[in-house]
């Protein structure tokens, strides 16, 4: 059907939907809904690793969705992976960037890879929208010694 579910960060009365954990969609992402058997509608990013399989194998369980016109006061979880050369203060610099924006750090893990001289950093952030997340990503990319920044 052509019914489009309109999403915002607050719960809709009577409609059970959740942001999918595999791709953590945030306000403004290209998304679709997948009607699960037992867990309501799960919202996935179009770029989700599972998206192609779900769209191909279960087209009858796909729900078209779009975001409300403006973000609500809620926040969304987002995961980033940052690869950087091992340098003094680089972790502080990354933290400073995150704190510059309307984001909250939820988790921050650093694995040191001495063999290739890099830090492999994974972090979880609460963000109001993908626009704010994009600002964080592009600002981290401007730091010296950053090898790669990807959203997970």
Residue ranges of model-derived segments:
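Catalytic cores of nucleotide-enabled group-transfer and carboxylate-activating enzymes in metabolic
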Residues: 144-147
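N-terminal non-catalytic structural scaffold regions of very large proteins
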Residues: 1-91, 102, 106-116, 123-124, ...
């Amino acid at each position: 059907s052509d019914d489009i579910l309109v999403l915002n960060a607050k719960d809709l009365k009577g409609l059970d939907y959740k942001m999918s954990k595999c791709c953590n969609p945030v306000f403004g992402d290209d998304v679709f809904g997948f009607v699960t058997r037992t867990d309501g509608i799960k919202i996935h990013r179009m770029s989700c690793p599972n998206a192609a399989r779900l769209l191909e194998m279960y087209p009858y369980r796909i729900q078209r969705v779009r975001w409300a016109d403006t973000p609500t006061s809620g926040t969304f979880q987002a995961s980033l992976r940052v690869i950087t050369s091992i340098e003094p203060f680089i972790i502080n610099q990354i933290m400073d960037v995150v704190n510059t924006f309307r984001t909250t750090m939820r988790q921050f893990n650093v694995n040191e890879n001495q063999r290739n001289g890099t830090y492999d950093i994974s972090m979880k952030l609460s963000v109001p929208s993908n626009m704010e997340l994009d600002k964080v990503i592009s600002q981290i990319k401007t730091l010296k010694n950053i090898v790669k920044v990807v959203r997970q």
